[in-house]
């Protein structure tokens, strides 16, 4: 079996990977008075609570070049995954670290993948890389296959709150406040360019669920793997699991709590859904 290290920034929500040499590189969430490092010591629920009451600016900070260089290690081949470059500088710093490591040791091969997404969709890419590695695929073939596979994965999200997006200037504060008051959930997707694209608005959990299922069908889901990350919303995640299994027979679906960075964007009640087409 060809062995290589898999590295990803913490937007993937994965801290460890059974049977693989895996390293998570933390992003950081900051306010004027608090800092939350998205590692295995982070209390996500506490972070969510603090951010809900934050009146000032909040923002995320990407890993620096030294963080990525340390994660890549001193030798061996590496495939690395980052949150979409449209939301973060993580891809840029990872590429700079790749260049540095390959200059130190020209025999190394480091592939950095801009996921153009976050959370559950990155998890699917990582699982694909691990599966290919376990099957003994050549490193260069794995890198090509991941880029091709990325064309057939998607991310949908549904947000109960847009407080943090408003606090870091990504959405209008008045619109975010009104949506919260009216109980409107924003549903969107990661576009093919890696931007956040709003698709519609729903009121209530059932309508949100139906909207997500409809969008999965529209985007070509017929089965395969589905990953659902939630921020303090296990009930919707469970209902989605059941409905997805009913609507797409043979689908393999898993749900889990989001970690720090994705919980920052999804906020309490939010759902992120990655799937194949």
Which role does the model predict for each range below?
Residues 2-3, 11-29, 33-34, 87-90, ...:
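Mixed-charge interfacial surface used for oligomerization/domain docking
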Residues 34-103:
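Class I S-adenosyl-L-methionine
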Residues 76-80, 103-113, 255:
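Glycine/charged-rich beta-loop-alpha catalytic/anionic-binding loops adjacent to active sites
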Residues 7:
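Generic enzyme active-site microenvironment
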Residues 59, 80, 112, 227-228:
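Short catalytic-loop micro-motif centered on adjacent basic/acidic residues
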